[in-house]
Regions:
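Typically the conserved alpha-helix immediately C-terminal to a functionally engaged Cys/Sec
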Residues: 65-82, 172-188
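Active-site beta-to-alpha loop of glycosyltransferases that engages the nucleotide-sugar donor
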Residues: 61-62
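N-terminal leader/targeting and pre-domain segments
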Residues: 4-56, 76, 80-164, 169-172, ...
Length: 193
């Protein structure tokens, strides 16, 4: 009887460990990262490309070795930039057909799904937050404009009922957050830098 119980316990533990190993890399309770599957891929990624949403997907196999090491970087990215970019993971051991359909054959693979009409593309850079954000920032449409002495008065006096957003800074260029914010406004003429 003890042998049978030991055998049952062994198989139970083996199944628990195996199912956890094949499970999702990202814990939904720990971040807003989306665990993709065949049921939600189109609604979460494909359909959002028409809405200026940039998605960054980590295609992985639970046993690929590197994904577990790089998981924390992806979670950190999600915490910092979840409102700007959609970050997701896709378990290719579980969903082989979907990964194959996306052209993924090795793991880990990182792909960017920029707004249409740009095609999805493989990210070849280092898996470091600053490098990834810098690369993703290239795909952010910019509707913000720089104010100067020639257009400031026109801006202030035009359409007084519409709220205006101003950023005063001594830095060159328009910050990524302002580029993303400018997309939330219907008319590009009302966000100035």
């Amino acid at each position: 009887m003890k042998q049978i119980l030991s055998l049952i316990t062994f198989f139970f533990l083996f199944n628990v460990i195996s199912s956890k190993h094949e499970g999702e890399l990202y814990d939904a309770g720990r971040s807003t990262l989306i665990n993709l599957n065949p049921m939600n891929f189109d609604t979460q990624i494909t359909n959002n490309r028409n809405k200026n949403i940039i998605s960054f997907i980590h295609f992985y196999s639970p046993d690929d070795g590197k994904s577990n090491e790089l998981k924390e970087v992806f979670i950190e990215l999600d915490k910092e930039y979840s409102g700007m970019f959609k970050l997701a993971g896709l378990n290719c051991k579980k969903y082989k057909d979907l990964c194959s359909k996306q052209g993924v054959t090795e793991f880990p693979t990182y792909k960017i799904y920029p707004p249409l009409p740009a095609p999805p593309m493989k990210y070849e850079g280092k898996i470091e937050p600053k490098k990834i954000i810098s690369y993703l920032g290239r795909f952010v449409e910019n509707k913000a404009q720089e104010l100067n002495n020639n257009n400031f008065d026109d801006f202030i006096s035009s359409k007084s009922s519409i709220p205006k957003v101003l950023l005063f800074t001594n830095k060159k260029g328009i910050p990524l957050i302002f580029k993303r914010l400018s997309l939330q406004f219907d008319v590009s003429k009302y966000i100035y830098y």
